[in-house]
Amino acid sequence: MRRVVYLVGLAIGMCMLSSCAAISRGDAPPDDMKSPDAALVYGYVEADNDNIVQVDFLQYNRLYVSPFKAPPRVLVFDDGVFMAENIKPGNYVIAGFRSERNNYNLSRSKRQSYQHIFRIKPGDMHYLGSYNLHVTQTGKIEYGDFKVTELERPGEREVLMRLYDATEGTAWQDKIARRLKELRQ
């Protein structure tokens, strides 16, 4: 009897873990727009011989203590496109990227974080850019063991076209369509 209870608990735990992994990989659908002041932050990231699964997107000068306060959710899709929806206005920073094998920490101190702050305004659509992470020294990845290069492609338009399909049925899709129209002109 105890073994059955143990196996059922193990099965439930595995299901919960797999659902968390799906959310971090962008398999979960984006949430609908919660208010007109909510912002959308998006971009693209790739790593040489590595698959980025998480973007550490944090509000600057905010302490996140699990389970009470969590950082904004960032969906990372298999093609490297990422998005964070329903972002409140404020100052934010990309603290790093995580892959299945490595952590790419972009800032190790408050001073380094301060140099990369960007401001989100109410109702903003903020494109962070497209980046490549190149490991310069093999072994344990620490700050300085990799190089971040800005890419020309995919550009904002290509990233938004991918997100247009991913946000089907939400108010974000209309907002993305308007931004795509602006970029065509």
Region locations from a protein language model:
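Beta-strand-rich interaction surfaces with strong enrichment in secreted/lumenal proteins
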Residues: 71-73, 83, 115-119
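Bacterial N-terminal signal peptides that target proteins for export
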Residues: 1-8
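Bacterial N-terminal signal peptides
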Residues: 8-18
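Primarily secretory-pathway and cell-envelope proteins
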Residues: 20-66, 102-185
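Short, acidic Ser/Thr/Gly-rich low-complexity loop/linker segments typical of extracellular
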Residues: 68-78
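Short Pro-Gly-centered beta-turn/loop motif in secreted/extracellular proteins
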Residues: 78-91, 97-101
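Short, solvent-exposed coil/turn segments
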Residues: 77-80, 111-113
